[in-house]
A protein has these predicted regions:
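Second-shell loop/turn segments in exported
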Residues: 1, 17-29, 35-38, 64, ...
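Single conserved hydrophobic/aromatic residue that forms the stacking wall/gate
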Residues: 1-6, 10-11
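Sec-exported extracytoplasmic/periplasmic mature domains
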Residues: 8, 40-44, 53, 57, ...
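Active-site-proximal beta-strand/loop segments in catalytic clefts of secreted hydrolases
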Residues: 15-18, 50-54, 80-83, 118-121, ...
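Extracytoplasmic/secreted envelope proteins and their assembly/folding machinery
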Residues: 29-36, 96-103, 132, 148-151, ...
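Active-site microenvironments of hydrolase-like enzyme catalytic domains
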Residues: 34, 38-83
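Active-site-adjacent substrate-binding region
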Residues: 91-118
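Active-site-adjacent mobile loop/cap segments within catalytic or ligand-binding domains
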Residues: 114-164
Length: 164
């Protein structure tokens, strides 16, 4: 479902490899290999987004939504990794600034679309670029339509924040 949600954005290069098979353990190591290969193949890449949904209440009904116009939209949360876990990550502040820029524009255009940014001690492969983040689109209880609706608004926010 993350691939379907991601396809709703205007993405030039997308890697839809499942890295949590055969187990979630080691998925970030496997995805780092893909990211590095993708960056070599696409050296002009400026933004790296690791698209997730919030797993809080796995299998539960937690569904953070906001109503924008006539649409019920899954809320979006950035997760920013740091070097707090001991791994080198000199770009985390730049990644945080990028997320803040997007969230501020989102709050201006569509109040409630974004949840507060979560900053964590793990680096989540975000050391690969100056605009590398995890974006959690909704949670386990959100419907696919709510998540797809978020992408429509997120695309507009990113266009306004980054291209104007």
């Amino acid at each position: 479902s993350a691939c379907l949600v991601g396809s709703e954005m205007c993405i030039r290069d997308s890697d839809e490899t499942y890295h949590d098979y055969p187990a979630y353990s080691g998925s970030y190591n496997r995805s780092l290999t893909s990211i590095k290969n993708d960056l070599v193949a696409n050296p002009n890449t400026q933004i790296v987004i690791d698209l997730h949904r919030d797993a809080v209440g796995e299998g539960g009904t937690y569904a953070p939504t906001v109503k924008i116009g006539d649409d019920y939209v899954a809320q979006i949360m950035f997760v920013i990794g740091t070097d707090g876990g001991g791994l080198t990550h000199s770009q985390w502040v730049q990644n945080l600034k990028y997320a803040i820029k997007i969230v501020e524009k989102g709050n201006e255009l569509y109040p409630g679309l974004f949840k507060p940014i979560m900053v964590r001690n793990s680096r989540y492969n975000q050391h690969v670029a100056k605009a590398a983040t995890i974006m959690e689109i909704g949670a386990t209880g959100n419907t696919m339509d709510q998540c797809l609706n978020s992408m429509k608004y997120l695309s507009k926010v990113m266009d306004e924040a980054l291209n104007k």
